[in-house]
Amino acid sequence: KKCPKAWEYKYIQKLKGTLQANTHLKRGSNIHLLLEHFEELLEYLKTKDIQKLDFYFKENEISLEDFMNSEELKIVLEFANSELGKDILYKKSVREQEILFDSEFNVFLGDRKDSNFVGFIDRVNISDDSLELIDFKTGKYKEPNFQKYDQLMVYAMYMFKRYKVNKIKIRFVYVEHNLENSLELSPSMIEFWSNSLKNTVTEIHNTKRFKKNKNNLCPWCDFVLICDPKLIKNRKDYDKIKDQIPKEILEKIEN
């Protein structure tokens, strides 16, 4: 909905962004990484077994000293010591980061056999008769009336069927602010969201042309060099990222 064209590039054409992640995005990515592997991080802090941090060093070329002094680690540990952090990170969880609606779940996709639904979720906490689906957020806090729950509601459809629980709580957790927006769901809501998903799938299949939604964020889009290269000059850090731009595209931008 934000930009159908960017969605097409990523999920239909399966293109990858042409620029490296900027510092802000990398910071957010590392915070997510530490939270998703919080148990391993705790083990390292207890045992000093460096292998427990393999998940982090595979993604970052950084010394142990720099890691221990990093802003990302400080943010995660402060969150872990907060009341909200304790309520999330120390509960029993299951590794269900990737959600795939395969043939067993095709009831949600209707008669379409050529549709795949894949989703990713940061953390799933589990108790006897309920689940918590947790989406960690970095950056600015979003006020409750602006929070959209659609994506996690669709994930909840999968979880109700897989785990046979009576209640699922969706939690959008803003790590740096120790705030959350949450919503509780029951199995009775599945039918509505199942129909909503079917309609979305049908709409995608019937779309002949995905339109661009031009806005002020276009210069930072992963696909700006494919979609409208000249827009990248509107970035304040343009001079710093020019060396990442392929020569033939840079010539078109500069001319």
Segments predicted by a language model, with ranges:
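C-terminal, charged and often intrinsically disordered regions of DNA end-processing helicases
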Residues: 1-27, 252-255
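Short, cysteine/histidine-rich loop/knuckle motifs that typically chelate Zn2+
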Residues: 2, 220, 229
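Cys/His-rich metal-chelating microdomains
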Residues: 6, 224, 230
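Short, polar/flexible loop-turn hinges at active-site or ligand-entry regions and domain interfaces
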Residues: 15-22, 43, 141-143, 208-212
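Short microdomains enriched in Cys/His and/or Lys/Arg
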Residues: 24, 232-255
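A non-catalytic, helix-rich entry segment at domain boundaries
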Residues: 26-107
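Mg2+/Mn2+-dependent nuclease catalytic core
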Residues: 99-199
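Polybasic (Lys/Arg-rich)
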Residues: 190-224
